[in-house]
Design a protein with these regions (language model features):
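N-terminal export/targeting leaders of redox proteins
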Residues: 1-29, 126-128
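Aromatic- and Gly/Pro-enriched helix-to-coil junctions and flexible linker segments
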Residues: 22-128
């Protein structure tokens, strides 16, 4: 009798657990969530023609299109894979000396901002 009760309870609660899990997954928008971070933290150095980061790497962060184009070294975003995405490696401090330079800047990204960038890349880095 207890097994039947537990199975019934589990079947009843399973849809609730699925709804809660889906509701807690935050959808990240480039325009609403990511772009304001880029404008606040990155665009001064990564905008043509004179931004220091732009002149050194060719990485232009003025638009989604130029971000996705990448730098002279190649793409900086691997949609769906923040672990292999060079941008994430930099802002998360996983890129050696260059990451340390970013951390010393006057206005480094907060942990929450880094999380937003990570989630956006993991969700496919869409222009939405």
């Amino acid at each position: 009798m207890n097994a039947v009760y537990l199975i019934s309870l589990l079947i009843t609660l399973l849809p609730c657990l699925v709804v809660v899990a889906c509701a807690t997954k935050q959808h990240i928008s480039y325009q609403r969530d990511v772009r304001p971070i880029v404008v606040d933290k990155c665009i001064d150095c990564h905008s043509p023609p004179y931004g220091e980061g732009y002149t050194k790497t060719g990485l232009d962060l003025v638009s989604y299109k130029s971000l996705m184009k990448g730098s002279v070294y190649g793409p900086v975003i691997v949609p769906g894979n923040s672990k292999k995405s060079p941008l994430n490696m930099l802002v998360e401090g996983r890129a050696g000396d260059l990451a340390r330079v970013l951390k010393r800047q006057h206005n480094p990204m907060t942990d929450d901002e880094i999380k937003v960038i990570r989630l956006w890349v993991e969700q496919g880095a869409q222009n939405n």
